[in-house]
Amino acid sequence: MGIKNLKSLLLENKSLTILDDNLYKVYNGIFVDTMSIYIAVANCVRNLEELTTVFIKYVNGWVKKGGHVTLFIDRGSIKIKQDVRDKRRKYSKLTKDRKMLELEKCTSEIQNVTGFMEEEIKAEMQLKIDKLTFQIYLSDSDNIKISLNEILTHFNNNENVTLFYCDERDAEFVMCLEAKTHFSTTGEWPLIISTDQDTMLFASTDNHPKMIKNLTQLFKFVPSAEDNYLAKLTALVNGCDFFPGLYGASITPNNLNKIQLFSDFTIDNIVTSLAIKNYYRKTNSTVDVRNIVTFINDYANLDDVYSYVPPCQCTVQEFIFSALDEKWNNFKSSYLETVPLPCQLMYALEPRKEIDVSEVKTLSSYIDFENTKSDIDVIKSISSIFGYSNENCNTIVFGIYKDNLLLSINNSFYFNDSLLITNTKSDNIINIGY
């Protein structure tokens, strides 16, 4: 659940490390994202009785380690989650239909088991039937709520367990807010127990060490500013609970080493991070990039986004070119687009040295409005006259690609209003810089 791949990305970035759970016996309080853990337990058992027994056993075990356990429980409807709920219902129905077909098949097959080890085979198949039946039961969200509420009544009079209801707010969101308050008074984060990867986004906003646990693993998380940036970037690209992500892009452990990471989650930095491949503008659609980035920032920082209108999904191309439009349009306002490239270059370059009379004559000889083909030697000569170099540039100002004049950002990529070329795939580009 939550932000896809975030846990594996933070592990890859070395800020999240796996620890031996048995070595850590005592914590300064334990905060639990109840629904995520409840669902994780439910997926491992065969019936409500077993679910109740196992869940209570987990909570009692946490009490022994933390002294006090706070169960954060979702309650009420979250308006901005309607699209997420609709999508989950759709996938839940597909999963339920698939499991019902599987149940029918198992129920039919068990009748035909005979011969050697018949009882053992039937017992194994019956376990599978029981588990499928229970999973189908839990595919109804009302059944999940009813069964969870019934289990929670076992803790009503337990002074070591607090039931913290989160009205119209996600439990993991409220849990991390309360964890920050806990830290401000005790100087230490409580143990966070959750399977939702949004939790790691919320936990990345300060550099204090945290212990985070799911059902099977214990992690130590010591985030840097770069990890916070990575968490936000992953929420933006891969999607989170309230934003579906950038269609056509995904951050995975396999491509993480190609992505440039920063400390500040700014539009320029984000586009630089995304520029690990070439992109071409496919539509003229523009999106409100600032609104999307502000939403991700506010969500990660645990600001109250529940009154916001969440941004709509867009393609990675729409995001990138919408983000770059302002820079290109500012440049284009002082850019002669309809003349041959040598003339464009003379107009666009700001001299970095004095140009003498002989060089002016040379430049004049290059003005040919009838010749639409660009000569590489002419391009290099113009650059040199204006005080620029084409090789070993510390700062790249422009790139020339197939008679296109491209801007450069951070020496990381080149772009105009219709294409972006990463500097790792720039063999055919002439650099102009210093």
Swiss-Prot record:
Q: Which GO terms describe its biological process?
A: DNA repair
**Alphabetized Pfam families for the sequence:** Pox_G5 (PF04599)
The chain's coiled-coil residues are none
What EC number(s) are associated with this protein in UniProt?
A: 3.1.-.-
Q: Where on this chain does Mg(2+) 1 bind?
A: D33, D74, E168, D170
Does the keyword Metal-binding feature in the UniProt annotation? yes
The protein's location, in the record's own words, is: Virion
Entry keyword Phosphoprotein: no
**Name of this protein:** Putative nuclease OPG089
Q: Which organism is it from?
A: Vaccinia virus (strain Copenhagen)
- Print the organism lineage: Viruses, Varidnaviria, Bamfordvirae, Nucleocytoviricota, Pokkesviricetes
